[in-house]
Amino acid sequence: MIKRISISNFKNLLNVPALECDRINALIGPNGSGKSSFLQAIDFLRAFFLTSVEVYLRDHDWDFRDLPNLREARKTISWDIEAELPPGANGRGAGFYHYKVALSPRRYLGVSEECLEYKASFSSPYELLLNREGRSVQWLNRRTGNNEKFKEIGLPASVISRLEPHLAHDKHPELLRFREWVENFRAFLLWDPKVLRTPDRGKHDTLGPSGEHLAPLLAKLKREKPEAFTKLVNRVKRLFPTVSDISVKGGRAWGWQTLHLHEANGHAVVFNSQQMSDGVLRLLALTSLLYLERIHSVITFEEPENGVHPQLIREVVQVLKELTLRKAPNQCQVFFTTHSPYVLDEFFDHPEQVFLVERGRPLEGATIRRLSQRPQLKIVRDAFEQSLGEAWVNGMIGATAGAKL
């Protein structure tokens, strides 16, 4: 998991000093404050482990010129993260990692600086595994114990992206483990009910950013993990008492597959995905993540409670918390944004898991701090009796819209 992260010059994040992160992290603040920028900056780390950063930009329809903070003259964007990782599938690579990387547009877009340090235990000193400054690259060969020069010039991504696992597993086991962890990040946007209910086909192990592949994903779960699928259905039935079953129709070979919702109240009725409610679809998609065999190492969500009845928002937060309780090698960390005071209420006993995101003036960089650092927190909790959300709406803890109503 990410233990600490610092980001410089990425969109609204002009200079975010080192933030201590938890297994689950909620971001609150007004529109345009920088919450989404923070989530995007985390997911952008995946770009360095593709063949080129440009691939990530094309996939997201981004132009690099739109990424640096508009107030800053320099265009270099930098990340500095510390992470604690469990062992990989091969049982290697557990420990603490410190990774620094900078993205700069010179004659071409590329990585101008990259450094990875590692230690097996918290009390051990860091060992330098990779150091890159411009075209000068050195990395540690575990097999020989020597630092070696990397010879490729003008690499538009991380040096680690060039490693072949079958050739480098004994030379660079920690580099491969770190890459594996970052490659397994997943960013979920606002889940679109239109996308969730659309018939789909093919084999998929997870949902797409906007909720793509829900039908084939559930079909695979029912086929390969029937007990897990039954648990998912039972959980949905508990939330929606009129629901009696969920099924997926079609899908022979590579055919299209469609969700169906069954209800029973004296007589059975079957609704296809086009007739299912938005809230049911969203909760079904979110809850399905709990029962997948493999889960992402870091997940970011944009407003996962969106479209869900207020009485069920507690269930949304509960699912997110349960995702973070999975054991190695499926450990998962969650970052999400919210505008719901009901969500904030669920963190009354853990304000250290809430980040306040604010911007004072136009073009000013975002400030991000833990709610637990607010000096007035104790007074607010005593005054508002179990409702941080009410205190937030009333402007008592900051991160408010500032609208003059």
Language-model segments: which ranges?
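Phosphate-binding P-loop
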Residues: V16-D22, Y291-R294, K327-A328
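Phosphate-binding glycine-rich loops of NTP-binding sites
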Residues: R23-H60, R282-L289, Q318-V319, T337, ...
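Conserved P-loop NTP-binding catalytic core
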Residues: Q40-Y108
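Short glycine-/polar-rich loops that comprise or flank the Walker A/P-loop
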Residues: T76-I77, R107-L109, E183-N184, H350-Q353
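Electropositive, glycine-dotted interaction segments
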Residues: A89-N234, R238
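Conserved ABC ATPase signature
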Residues: H213, T230, N234-Y291, V298-I313
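C-terminal lobe/lid and adjacent interdomain/linker elements of RecA-like ASCE P-loop ATPase modules
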Residues: R314-L405
